[in-house]
C-alpha cells in the first residue's frame, strides 16, 4: 500500500488489500463505491480518504481523474488521510 496524490493534490491510498479494508471497516462484504462490484479477493483497491470511499482499480482510475481538490476541505482531508495511514500502517 502506498499513499499518493493526484495531479491536483488529492490524497489516495493505492493497492489496498480487501482483508485490510474488512479489518478497518468491520464490513465483511465490501463493494466498489462506483460500480458496486464485490471486492472480496481484490488486493489492488484505491481508497480516497476525503470521500471515505474505496474503488476497484478500474473505477478508481476514472474517479481519480475527475476528483476536484477544494482548499476548504484541506483540514478534513488531512485528518482522514492520517487516520487511514495510521490504521493501515502507512508512512505519511
Language-model regions: role of each:
Residues 41-42, 65:
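Short, non-ligating residues that shape and space the ligands of small metal-coordination modules
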Residues 29-35, 48, 56:
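Short cysteine-rich clusters marking metal-coordination/redox-active sites
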Residues 32, 42-43:
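Glycine-centered loop/turn motifs
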